[in-house]
Amino acid sequence: MFKKFDEKENVSNCIQLKTSVIKGIKNQLIDQFPGIEQWLNQIMPKKDPVKIVRCHEHIEILTVNGELLFFRQREGPFYPTLRLLHKYPFILPHQQVDKGAIKFVLSGANIMCPGLTSPGAKLYPAAADTVVAIMAEGKQHALCVGVMKMSADDIEKINKGIGIENIHYLNDGLWHMKTYK
């Protein structure tokens, strides 16, 4: 999604949100990420301006004080940015890939089933279409944010094909954007 993303070319406009819209977004985030509720006022303080940065391909990035927090495509689910995920790693359930998959994940490749079932990888129970953080064997922080294309049980049984779709990874265009004023 952000492989060839460039802040100067892809951002079309920025809109400050009304408090009623912010409340709706906060409720949507609580529904989508149940563990975030007690931290939401710390992530999105009430008095700070919340803005939506609109980009090409119907991508919207939610920012507070210029810090990129969440993004979504069209009216789809929100995904946390990796910078937010590094501060609050408990927001998303984790899946772990083995060392051999790291360079492919960091180049934007989807996570294949064998990379999740081999020694060194850890596959935790999760349903299909769950938003997950991809961790790596021997690393502390998440490599990417992805969406489960199969359930964890199916990944173990089938062990072929794409297991997790890579949505946003370290050093992609969104990672390089850092802040937006």
Curated annotation (Swiss-Prot):
It is found in: Cytoplasm. The keyword Lipoprotein does not apply. GO terms for cellular component: cytoplasm. Residues 92-171 form the PUA domain. Keywords: Cell cycle, Cytoplasm, Growth regulation, Transcription, Transcription regulation. The keyword Cell cycle applies. It comes from the Eukaryota. GO terms for molecular function: RNA binding. SUPFAM superfamilies: PUA domain-like. The PUA RNA-binding domain is critical for cap binding, but not sufficient for translation enhancer function. Plays a role as translation enhancer and involved in cell cycle regulation. Belongs to the MCTS1 family. NCBIfam families: unchar_dom_2 (TIGR00451). This is Malignant T-cell-amplified sequence 1-A. It comes from Xenopus laevis.
